[in-house]
């Protein structure tokens, strides 16, 4: 299968925090891969900024090191050619130093160009950056990219939205969630709305329940301070899992464009019922001395931490499509395997013509998002042999890597896709301000309830599937989690 390279217009991409970890690990390698793929037009420029006293030569050396370390591909000649697009300006993101110097190269180019500002800095600097870009005459027609977290609760999310809206239109703001840039996450819409096999059955009449699992084997190394303030509910549930829930549950948009898709996602969030306290489980991983693994509290250096590294909950959507069908969501650190999967459990047939001896079986659609991207549909057939009509479940499995060849086995990195979407002006995979606020409005009461009740996370064994209470959450409803598999 031949990959299509969609051309983009010439652009200037200014990276605030251009020497930081995100720029080195994600942004610059993604741009280099698009350069190698032939998607970076002649005249495209990348301008790194930071407070440090570098010059363009020094910055190019830093970029080359980052590409060697984090890209893992490309020849020396390709890297050198890419570096010719890269320059550096010393700019104080929290002050006024360097802004006139930054404006010079941007204004010297003639002709139509896309102007992007990537806020690869701490969220507390977003408002000041937006104001300075505007004050120095660089906001008109520009696009800004901001990274999550988009606030830490509803109040701070509103404050952030208001700060950005004071200088930029919503159509200029791109709130990037790298999870939405994954090829398989986008495939959710294709699976749902491109296959008449599924859409007529995609409702509470036929679906018993839906499970969404995002399991990680890693702990919180390198993010200790942030994570102990945030926890799994803020870091994962409020955004990544919420977005998966929206894509699975939303109504068909009128067309595949940014506002139509985001309108439907917003409707899902607003239709979510408040989560009941007995419908949610928090967990915190324990240490394993034999394996040399620290506990969560040891990892973050806080012996009294009540922050969750795991959360599982049952959600209900009060609309005509999903009333009565529960959604079970779980995510956690230091679990048995790295796995992101959506399991759609269909209902049993209302009556079995084969009798009770044949057994009762329900269909299952499993959508694997990572690491082995693909789809499995469990169907029921007759068991071979002469023992009467005995039914057995068999999987119809499709691996994207096998079905789509090279393109399926090496999909574009999420940052590659999302940065190119910003350049094209496509906001479909970016969260809108009202969507962010609605997600926090649903999340905040849960977190506030934990604080008010003094809830403490349940301990769970490292390299397990999570706390036992999460299994009880399902068993009380006569259901069980599908296994977490690598």
Give a label for each model feature.
Residues 1-145, 150-486:
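Secretory/organelle targeting and membrane-embedding segments
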């Amino acid at each position: 299968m031949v990959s299509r390279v969609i051309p983009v217009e010439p652009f200037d991409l200014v990276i605030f925090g251009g020497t930081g970890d995100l720029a080195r690990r994600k942004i610059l390698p993604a741009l280099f891969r698009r350069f190698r793929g032939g998607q970076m037009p002649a005249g495209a420029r990348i301008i790194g900024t930071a407070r440090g006293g570098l010059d363009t030569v020094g910055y190019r050396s830093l970029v080359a090191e980052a590409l060697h370390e984090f890209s893992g591909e490309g020849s020396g000649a390709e890297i050198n050619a890419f570096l010719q697009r890269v320059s550096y300006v010393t700019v104080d993101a929290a002050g006024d130093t360097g802004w006139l110097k930054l404006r010079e190269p941007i204004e010297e180019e003639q002709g139509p160009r896309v102007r992007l500002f990537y806020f690869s800095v701490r969220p507390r600097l977003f408002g000041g950056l937006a104001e300075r870009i505007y004050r120095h005459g660089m906001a008109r027609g520009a696009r800004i990219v901001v990274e999550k977290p988009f606030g830490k609760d509803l109040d701070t999310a509103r404050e952030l939205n208001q700060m950005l809206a004071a200088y930029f239109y919503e159509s200029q703001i791109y709130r990037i969630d790298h999870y939405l840039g994954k090829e398989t996450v986008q495939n959710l819409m294709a699976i749902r709305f491109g296959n008449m096999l599924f859409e007529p059955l995609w409702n509470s009449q036929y679906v018993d329940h839906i499970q969404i699992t995002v399991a990680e084997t890693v702990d919180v190394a390198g993010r200790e301070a942030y994570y102990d303030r945030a926890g799994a509910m803020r870091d994962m549930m409020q955004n990544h899992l919420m977005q998966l829930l929206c894509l699975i549950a939303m109504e068909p948009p009128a067309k595949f464009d940014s506002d139509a898709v985001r309108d439907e996602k917003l409707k899902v969030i607003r239709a979510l019922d408040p989560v009941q306290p007995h419908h949610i489980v928090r967990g915190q991983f324990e240490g394993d001395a034999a394996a040399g693994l620290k506990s969560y509290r040891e990892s973050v250096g806080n012996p009294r931490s009540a922050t969750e590294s795991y959360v599982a909950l049952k959600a209900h959507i009060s609309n005509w499509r999903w009333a009565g069908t529960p959604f079970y969501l779980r995510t956690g650190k230091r679990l048995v395997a790295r796995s992101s999967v959506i399991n759609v459990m269909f209902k049993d047939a209302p009556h079995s013509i084969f009798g009770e001896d044949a057994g009762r079986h329900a269909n299952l659609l499993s959508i694997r998002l990572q690491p082995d991207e693909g789809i499995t549909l469990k169907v029921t057939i007759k068991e071979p042999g002469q023992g009467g009509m005995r039914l057995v479940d068999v999987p119809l499995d499709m691996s994207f890597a096998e079905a789509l060849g090279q393109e399926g086995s090496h999909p574009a990195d999420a940052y590659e896709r999302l940065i190119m979407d910003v350049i094209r002006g496509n906001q479909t995979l970016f969260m809108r301000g009202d969507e962010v606020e609605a997600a926090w409005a649903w999340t905040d009461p849960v977190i506030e309830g934990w604080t008010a009740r003094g809830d403490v996370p349940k301990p769970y064994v490292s390299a397990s599937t999570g706390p036992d209470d999460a299994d009880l959450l399902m068993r009380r409803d006569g259901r069980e989690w599908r296994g977490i598999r690598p």
